[in-house]
Amino acid sequence: MRLYRDTAVVLRLHKLGEADHIVTLLTRQFGLVRAVAKGVRRTTSKFGARLEPFAHIDVQLLPGKNLDIITQVQTVDAFATDIVDDYSRYTTACAVLETAERLAGEERAPAPQLQRLTVGALRAIAEQARPVEFVLDAFLLRAMGYAGWAPALEECARCSAPGPHRAFHVAAGGAVCTYCRPAGAATPSPGVLDLMEALLRGEWEGTDSAPATLRTQASGLVAAHLQWHLERQLRTLPLIERSRPHAAVEVDLSVRQDGTRDSTTRTANSA
């Protein structure tokens, strides 16, 4: 069996035996890969801290029957150094990793765009170039675009009527016009959907001056839209202060007796 190399982001670790780790990687060419790092928990390990979550690495692997084996590791970016010492950056980066793993799908399904988005988000968090809530929301919106779940923000999600539209409904797919608006649709404050569109497109100019109320509502809608499609909540989002349920935006996901999901998006202005 031939060795192979790839660049990867370390998503998470699991202990294996007394000295090993199972490492979950998001690689550029092969998507999700689970591999064993032998002896990594020993103080004499040749891998050192290079196989910690948030690390961007160049890795050499030996294919195995169930799990590959990591044979060499070189650090490309040591993002963890600037992430783990700050709670906000740490929890935000954890949400990025969890989302990336959930969206990557099956093991060994190539996901180069998702890997690039993940590396870019971790770099922005580590460098503190922008508010972490904007980095996370921009990542989530773009990652949903990669998965085919990007919310409609400029035209009606149901009839494609050009906007701007005021209402937003998660199950409908995003912004909805007056005629298509379902019961329970949210009516976010003016500027919220524009802020989400700017984050999706990477148009950062002016985002820093967005009022806190708009940021909160945008974050709530982004998280709700993602979790509707994932069908269950991300474990890491409740750890992030701005992602907790707010009076401004709250989404109730429930399952009807016929097994279909019901979504009601509420805001302070819900009708």
From Swiss-Prot:
Coiled coil: none annotated. SUPFAM superfamilies: ArfGap/RecO-like zinc finger (SSF57863), Nucleic acid-binding proteins (SSF50249). It comes from the Bacteria. One of its GO terms (biological process) is double-strand break repair. Signal peptide: none annotated. One of its GO terms (cellular component) is bacterial nucleoid. Keywords: DNA damage, DNA recombination, DNA repair. The keyword DNA damage applies. Belongs to the RecO family. Involved in DNA repair and RecF pathway recombination. This is DNA repair protein RecO.
